[in-house]
Amino acid sequence: MPKQKIRIRLKAFDHAILDQSAQKIVETAKRTGAEVSGPIPLPTKREVITILRAPHKYKDSREQFEIKTHKRLIDILNPTPKTVDALMKLDLPSGVDIEIKL
């Protein structure tokens, strides 16, 4: 019988909230008897936006803004029904995007 695996990908702009959420997921999974691999840090996506400071001319005067998207990967091996139920009831911050694959 093949082993079952749950893969959880977390994304957030703030790395501190992301790490707290990952830690909550890992603690919950371990407490319910599943094996956990991770959190594995994935490459951070850095998006830079350049705009003109002045509304009409002065093209040499520009300003740059950047936004970083931090990502983490968690694999839960051999999850029990209790593990799945506990993960569904877990309350995580609103700034974290969660993608779950079975």
UniProtKB/Swiss-Prot annotation:
In alphabetical order, the GO MF annotations are: structural constituent of ribosome; tRNA binding
Which Gene Ontology biological process is one annotated for this entry?
translation
Top-level taxonomic group: Bacteria
**UniProt cross-references to InterPro entries, sorted A to Z:** Ribosomal_uS10, Ribosomal_uS10_CS, Ribosomal_uS10_dom, Ribosomal_uS10_dom_sf
- In the UniProt record, which is one GO cellular component term? ribonucleoprotein complex
Q: Which SUPFAM superfamilies match?
A: Ribosomal protein S10
Q: Which Pfam families match?
A: Ribosomal_S10
Sorted keywords for this record are: Ribonucleoprotein, Ribosomal protein
Subunit and partners? Part of the 30S ribosomal subunit.
Write out the similarity annotation.
Answer: Belongs to the universal ribosomal protein uS10 family.
Q: Which PANTHER family match?
A: 30S RIBOSOMAL PROTEIN S10 FAMILY MEMBER
Name the NCBIfam families on file: PRK00596.1, rpsJ_bact
Chain's role: Involved in the binding of tRNA to the ribosomes.
**Protein's name according to its UniProt entry:** Small ribosomal subunit protein uS10
